């Protein structure tokens, strides 16, 4: 007797009075199938002895599958799809609020992983169970949406993006802190728009913030994109950054400032088409435009790093080459070096008996500083060794002891 290798599906809905043609009706039914590691179970034998093993089946782990009667073909067991979690408005607004409140910290930290963990913790306190990575990815997506809305809708993105205004406010606040007026070169570009653009940046490689490419940069501590740090820098992802969250127009990430920057010629996705270098001083990193004159570049650097004295400074590249400040300087990463000045010790004497009263250490950075010091003391020069008068700063010897001469 020949028995088919394939077991036919049993129609539990079929009446005894129905004609056999009803078997062609397409229905779906749910049946329980034993979950077992033995793939060689004889399905036909199982069919004949099903009623003997009914109680055993109930005690075993089971899984439900959906079978159709429309054909005699074997049916696949398909795992149910997991619905992607969506962010409700309250969650998104809370994320933006927390990110905005910590924006200043993103500008000074090389790794933002701990900052996203704090944001995640605050989200949980408000009843939103979102991990640091989920928060990072959502933030990057918001930045990407903002950039798309801004540049494709000519700045009128608020109509198509729910949180356009909130993101724009964060970027505007950042630009006010670090962007000097000289950056606005084009008369056709609104000041606010120019400032915001200078901090927007996308990265094709992905931000580990996820993006920025919008990747997971911030969440895992690696550079990702940054509206954060350069609109949070990864070349192209949005990262908002003052030092900056951020990946800049040349693709430099503030968190990983040694990353090779772009050449400035890539016009795809780059909100700022000028020449930009990345300058690092201590724990701070700034992206500086070098399209102006040498004097303008110096003033921008002084303003960006808060240099309020007249001490000299220079930029040194990764090959320890000191570069001239001009619009033709090579694009790349630079270290900001400050002049240590000239330190000497000055003794003050009692004019009546010529005995030393006290001494002080003075540091001069410019000839003008030296002249002002002499004028305040009422001296014409400084004297060393009791006979040599020094009238010019260049003749001073570091560490030497001097006295004033009227």
Swiss-Prot record:
**Where is it located?**
Nucleus
Outcome of mutating residue 133 to A: Decreases DNA-binding activity 2-fold
Coiled-coil regions, chain positions = none
Spell out the Basic and acidic residues composition-biased ranges: 1-19
Where does the UniProt entry say this protein principally localizes?
Answer: nucleus
Q: Which domain of life is it from?
A: Eukaryota
Cross-referenced InterPro entries, in alphabetical order?
A: Myb_DNA-bind_4, SANT/Myb
> Which stretches does UniProt call biased (Basic residues)?
46-57
Task: Extract one GO cellular component term from the record.
Answer: nucleus
- Provide the effect of residue 175 to D: No significant change in DNA-binding activity
Keywords of this protein's UniProt record, alphabetized?
DNA-binding, Nucleus, Phosphoprotein, Transcription, Transcription regulation
Modified-residue entries (Phosphothreonine), positions: 133
> Impact of altering residue 118 to P?
Abolishes DNA-binding activity
GO terms under biological process:
regulation of DNA-templated transcription
Quaternary structure and interacting proteins, as annotated: Binds DNA as homodimer.
Q: What does this protein do?
A: Probable transcription factor that binds specifically to the core DNA sequence 5'-GGTTAA-3'. May act as a molecular switch in response to light signals.
According to UniProt, the name of this protein is Trihelix transcription factor GT-1
Q: What is the lineage of its organism?
A: Eukaryota, Viridiplantae, Streptophyta, Embryophyta, Tracheophyta
